[in-house]
UniProtKB/Swiss-Prot annotation:
NCBIfam families assigned to the protein according to its UniProt record, in alphabetical order: rsmG_gidB
GO molecular function terms listed in the Swiss-Prot or TrEMBL record: rRNA (guanine-N7-)-methyltransferase activity
Keywords from the UniProt entry: Cytoplasm, Methyltransferase, rRNA processing, S-adenosyl-L-methionine, Transferase
Name of this chain's protein: Ribosomal RNA small subunit methyltransferase G
Gene name of this polypeptide: rsmG
Catalytic activity, reaction form: guanosine(527) in 16S rRNA + S-adenosyl-L-methionine = N(7)-methylguanosine(527) in 16S rRNA + S-adenosyl-L-homocysteine
Main location: cytoplasm
Length: 210
């Protein structure tokens, strides 16, 4: 184990102790490996503005996995996933759920496919496509994203993706009431959850829409 791996491992333990999440040792190792892969690829492909692997643990890994207890169902899509966030961390800690990770940028999907191989994940599929051109064989229990500027954009662009009784899970920083007022009448806010992300400065919310 390299010095960086050791530091990341210790840091992850400290962060997880501040949550109610139950994560196996193997999953912890996979999360660390994901940070190392992202750090390596980021130098060449500029996948994230976060440069420090320690910071990646908080802003990318913890910020993703804290959503895990709120997911209902088995079959999810992460739209505008970027370098696989929140989809890859969620897939690691939910091996019994299946995730499609969608992005329109080739270098991001190449990274995700490499990560799937390196991490030995069999519950993730990476798809290179724009969301409006992607038509799945079966609809999803949940549509996840931390990429959309507004709830209206997310529900408008992704309304063909969830099942009749499926949900949208929007990961957001600040939560503004105006966003709710912009929503089409066919969508309703089910829940707004203030997420506790250890050591993250600023608010994080999960907005669940149906």
């Amino acid at each position: 184990m390299t010095n960086l791996e050791q530091q990341l491992s210790q840091k992850l333990e400290i962060l997880l102790k501040q949550t109610a999440l139950s994560i196996t040792d193997q999953q912890k190792e996979q999360l660390i490996k994901l940070v190392l892969l992202l750090n390596k690829w980021n130098k060449a492909y500029n996948l994230t503005s976060v440069r420090d692997p320690m910071e990646m643990l908080v802003k990318h890994i913890l910020d993703s996995v804290v959503v895990s207890p709120h997911l209902q169902g088995k079959h999810f899509i992460d739209v505008g996933t970027g370098p696989g966030l929140p989809g890859l961390p969620l897939a690691i800690v939910n091996p019994n759920k299946h995730f499609v990770l969608l992005d329109s940028l080739g270098k991001r999907i190449s990274f995700i496919r490499n990560a799937i191989r390196e991490l030995g994940l069999d519950n993730v599929e990476a798809v290179l496509s724009r969301v409006e051109e992607y038509h799945p064989e079966q609809p999803f229990d949940g549509v996840l994203s931390r990429a959309f500027a507004s709830l209206k954009d997310m529900t408008d662009w992704c309304q063909h993706l969830p099942k009749q009784d499926g949900y949208f899970y929007a990961l957001k920083g600040l939560y503004h009431q105006e966003e709710v007022e912009e929503l089409s009448e066919k969508f309703t806010i089910q829940q707004v959850i203030r997420l506790q992300v250890p050591e993250l400065i600023g608010e994080r919310h999960l907005v669940i829409v149906k």
